[in-house]
């Protein structure tokens, strides 16, 4: 599923991401835009053999199990396929675990490069939340 900007903001808010670990909702919407273009089915293979999955491009080396990543830790205890669902609950729950790490949202390269230090509130402007 490809979410609309405000549709995704509303879903993320409902699932408790707004101000989770101090990151406002706009940060999450911005991250999703530049990680997956709001597409829950996005997958991208990395040079180390791991794959990033779903709307927040969660990595199989650490966070989920896809059965083909050597030394996978599966710290979210989920199959990576769960991160491709049109229902973003699994992605959000895993993202909460990721952002609770000391690096916070810096774990997301796209957030670090495209969202960090910008006016992320613009991503939810005009949305009825």
From Swiss-Prot:
**Which residues are the signal sequence here?**
none
Residue ranges of domain C-type lysozyme in the record: 1-129
Which GO molecular function entries does the Swiss-Prot or TrEMBL record give? lysozyme activity
- The chain's disulfide connectivity reads 6-127, 30-115, 64-80, 76-94
Q: Please provide the record's keywords in A-Z order.
A: Antimicrobial, Bacteriolytic enzyme, Disulfide bond, Glycosidase, Hydrolase, Secreted
Catalytic activity, as annotated: Hydrolysis of (1->4)-beta-linkages between N-acetylmuramic acid and N-acetyl-D-glucosamine residues in a peptidoglycan and between N-acetyl-D-glucosamine residues in chitodextrins
**Misc remark for this entry?**
Lysozyme C is capable of both hydrolysis and transglycosylation; it also shows a slight esterase activity. It acts rapidly on both peptide-substituted and unsubstituted peptidoglycan, and slowly on chitin oligosaccharides.
Q: What is this protein called?
A: Lysozyme C
Q: Which organism is it from?
A: Pavo cristatus (Indian peafowl)
